[in-house]
């Protein structure tokens, strides 16, 4: 029987709060092209402001203890990137493509992530706050102590992802895909859950009463139940 890791939980059985990124007291201003993303490169203790890092194709880059403000990563492709103890604010990740990448102790806020493809990735101690993530894909990725807060995730794809360590607060998940996802202990609070796909995979998740009402029609459809008006 394959080993299945347990979600990060606190003493009361609730998902633990993500650890805040550990940034140094001062950061060095990044300068391009010297501090650009490159294969097997290391970005350490740097601050990128209004930089254009779009349309890059990079493998095995390491980003540690960095801050990114209003940086453009649109259409960049990352393979086996390691990103830790870093903060992203107001960045554009539209149509970013990644594979086998890792986020550890990372905060992303007020960023555009429409169409992001984060496949077979690892996310641990991560917060997404106020991000636009329509049609983002996290297929086959693993989430441990990850919080989505106030995010727009309409038609996002979590197919076969391990979401047992994830929490969704005040998120729009209209039409999101959860087929074959692992969701024991996944929490939803004040979320829009209309038209979910793979709704039977929510077995074991924790949902507020108000959110549960939105699942009635999706569950009925999945079970072949017809709901008639009185």
What are these model-predicted stretches?
Residues 2-230:
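Tandem repeat scaffolds
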């Amino acid at each position: 029987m394959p080993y299945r890791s347990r979600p990060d939980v606190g003493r009361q059985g609730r998902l633990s709060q993500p650890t805040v990124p550990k940034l140094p007291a001062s950061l060095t201003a990044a300068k391009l092209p010297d501090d650009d993303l490159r294969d097997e490169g290391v970005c350490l203790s740097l601050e990128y402001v209004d930089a254009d890092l779009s349309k890059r194709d990079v493998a095995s880059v390491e980003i540690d203890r960095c801050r990114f403000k209003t940086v453009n990563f649109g259409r960049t492709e990352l393979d086996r990137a390691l990103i830790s103890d870093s903060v992203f604010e107001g960045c554009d990740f539209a149509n970013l493509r990644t594979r086998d990448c890792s986020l550890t102790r990372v905060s992303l806020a007020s960023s555009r992530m429409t169409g992001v493809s984060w496949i077979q990735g690892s996310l641990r101690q991560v917060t997404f706050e106020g991000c636009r993530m329509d049609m983002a894909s996290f297929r086959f990725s693993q989430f441990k102590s990850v919080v989505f807060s106030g995010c727009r995730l309409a038609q996002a794809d979590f197919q076969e992802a391990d979401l047992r360590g994830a929490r969704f607060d005040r998120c729009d998940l209209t039409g999101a895909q959860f087929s074959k996802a692992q969701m024991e202990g996944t929490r939803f609070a004040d979320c829009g859950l209309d038209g979910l796909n793979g709704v039977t995979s929510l077995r074991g998740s924790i949902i507020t009463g108000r959110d549960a009402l939105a699942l009635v029609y999706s569950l009925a459809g999945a079970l072949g139940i017809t709901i008639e008006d009185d």
